[in-house]
Curated annotation (Swiss-Prot):
Residues 20-48 bind DNA. The keyword Lipid metabolism does not apply. This is Glucose starvation modulator protein 1. GO terms for biological process: cellular response to starvation. PROSITE patterns: ZN2_CY6_FUNGAL_1 (PS00463), ZN2_CY6_FUNGAL_2 (PS50048). SMART domains: GAL4 (SM00066). Pfam families: PAS_13 (PF24990), Zn_clus (PF00172). It comes from Candida albicans (strain SC5314 / ATCC MYA-2876). Residues 65-93, 250-270 are annotated as: Disordered.
């Protein structure tokens, strides 16, 4: 056995620069002198020599000129003939010749296969491999833009390779978007050039010299190169997300004023735009894009901050009419039936019809009623439109002096700016939710409302509950009596909490709500406001607002408890 070393010996011992063969095989600590101590101790000093290290691949190669001269001086091997002989596919030889200049950028090309040199000079003399027996790697690695009929002969290695328009196959303008996962990293940049690229590719049909087509081929071949992909999977996923947002997203708000014609444009080129181009089916140009979008949605989580292709309006010139018609006519559509989920009723209608709180409060009195009875989603855009109209009425008026009008207008602008600071976040969070998701959010709100109404019955303080838009959904009888209103009158139609506040209290409320709407998860706010009675009298309250949030941390219900100051 090997002698056990003392701690001092272990501390003083230093590793050798290079071990001998024996110490390397036996995993022993070798010394720098030759013969080493271990070999002398075992009487094998005559065979003590340094181990020959295996050289790494990039040190074994030669420079590019040396490699070419080596190939010219190396005699070619004769092709052995036998009862069953196979030859290298013409595409393999083309691939090896084409990849040599590209890989030479890494300073050392891979060793050339001798079977390429043994290829006959004529293509007809090669024994063809049946399509069923052809290796899959040969099919997958075929250069997409090179014509196999113009094969480079191995008998003339010094011949320069020239790529002309006759050697290049005309690429499909949209065929580069088929590989979704590997090519999304470059789609972000290619989107900026995609529209011009498609147009110029069709204009080049009448270009006889073919120079523009050659430039497009070189540009598009870079799109298929793996060199543009990142080595980090996380970085690739980041670019996939950016590709989703930039390539497929439409306008960020359903408001007609924010509609972007260029984003909604599907780039469908009509023959009238290119009257001199014939025999081109312009309807097929957008088909690969739609397949890519569907493939993105099916393969991984899809991110979109706007309308997708199936939800966007088809006529960009009539977007205003589209949204107005959608809000006024209450477009409804039934959801598809699911696989019999006992919790969510998939037969429930997805509708924009308004259901007043007086009906829902009487309809859903227990938790089981939410699952046994029909539930309708709440359409928040209509609520925000109604809120905007109400604010214009509150802060407007023709019987005011110019100073009062200016003061009210400044308050209205402050409120609208505060709403604009957090509403886009609400829209982005709920943009890609399907109909069942919206029904689930409404079910969550109604379920929470049941608990809070029971809590309000046990609490002595007057309470009002409203949605994040300010729309009242519940009020206790004592609070309604303080404000000289009937609870049924406040719940039978769309009424807002701001109708019961004075102007300064409305501005203060929106300042407080904007601070906790996004980012700040504070759930309790204490403040003092003034409420208006039905007879226009003002009552000062000290109040506590409790914020109930949904699964996106967006305010869902605001529970206001009011204590009048006498």
């Amino acid at each position: 056995m090997t002698k056990k070393l003392t701690p001092q010996e272990k501390k003083n011992r230093k590793p050798a620069v290079r071990a001998c063969v024996f110490c390397h095989q036996k995993h022993l600590q070798c010394s720098n002198e030759r013969p080493c101590k271990n070999c002398v101790k075992r009487n094998i000093a005559h065979g003590c020599q340094d181990i020959v290290r295996k050289r790494v691949k990039y040190l074994t190669g030669e420079s590019v000129p040396g490699a070419v001269s080596n190939k010219q001086s190396t005699p070619r091997k004769k092709l052995k003939t036998g009862p069953v002989s196979t030859s290298v596919s013409p595409m393999d030889s083309v691939k090896s010749e084409l990849t040599t200049p590209v890989e030479s950028s890494n300073h050392f090309p891979p060793p050339m296969s001798s079977s390429v040199d043994a290829l006959p000079t004529t293509q007809h003399s090669a024994i063809e491999i049946p399509p069923n027996d052809q290796p899959i790697s040969d099919i997958l690695e075929v250069p997409p833009l090179f014509d196999s009929s113009h094969m480079i002969s191995s008998e003339a290695p010094e011949t320069n390779i020239t790529l002309t328009t006759q050697n290049l196959i005309t690429p499909d303008p949209l065929s580069f978007h088929t590989n979704t996962v590997s090519n999304t990293t470059t789609d972000v940049l290619n989107k900026l050039l995609n529209d011009n690229y498609e147009t110029e590719s069709m204009l080049s049909a009448n270009n006889s010299n073919g120079d523009h087509l050659l430039g497009m081929a070189h540009t598009s071949s870079g799109h298929l190169s793996n060199g543009q992909q990142f080595q980090s999977n996380y970085l690739n996923e980041e670019y996939m997300m950016l590709g989703d947002i930039i390539l497929q997203s439409k306008q960020a708000s359903p408001s007609p004023s924010n509609t972007s014609t260029s984003e909604n444009n599907t780039n469908t080129l009509s023959p009238s735009s290119f009257g001199y181009i014939s025999n081109i089916n312009f309807e097929d140009f957008n088909q690969p894009k739609r397949k890519v979008v569907q493939k993105l949605k099916d393969s991984r989580p899809f991110i979109s901050l706007g309308f997708t292709a199936d939800l966007a309006p088809h006529d960009n010139n009539n977007n205003t009419d589209y949204y107005d018609d959608k809000m006024t006519n209450n477009i409804t559509g039934k959801t598809e039936e699911g696989p019999g989920n006992p919790i969510i009723n998939y037969n429930t209608k997805f509708t924009t019809d308004y259901v007043p709180p007086s009906i829902t409060n009487n309809l859903y009195k227990t938790a089981s009623d939410l699952y046994s009875k029909e539930l309708k989603n709440f359409y928040y855009p209509l609520s925000y439109h109604a809120l905007t109209k109400l604010l214009k009425v509150i802060f407007g008026g023709n019987d005011l002096s110019p100073e009062e009008k200016q003061e009210k207008r400044s308050k209205l602008l402050i409120i609208l700016k505060l709403i604009a600071s957090y509403r886009p976040t609400f829209i982005a969070a709920h943009r890609d939710l399907i109909q069942e998701d919206l029904l689930m959010l409404e079910m969550t709100l109604q379920r929470s409302l049941l608990d809070y109404k029971k809590l309000a019955e046990l609490n002595s303080s007057p309470t009002i509950m409203w949605r994040r838009t300010g729309e009242i959904i519940s009020i206790t009888e004592d609070m309604a009596l303080l404000l000289e209103h009937s609870s049924f009158d406040l719940l039978k139609e769309r009424r807002f909490i701001f109708e019961l506040m004075d102007d300064n209290s409305i501005v203060d409320y929106f300042n407080l709500f904007a601070n906790i709407a996004v980012g700040n998860l504070k759930s309790v706010i204490q403040t003092a406001i003034q409420m208006k009675t039905k007879s226009s009298n003002l009552i000062k309250f000290t109040c506590v607002f409790t914020i109930k949030r949904d699964i996106f941390d967006i305010p869902m219900i605001v529970i206001g408890q009011f204590l009048p100051i006498v």
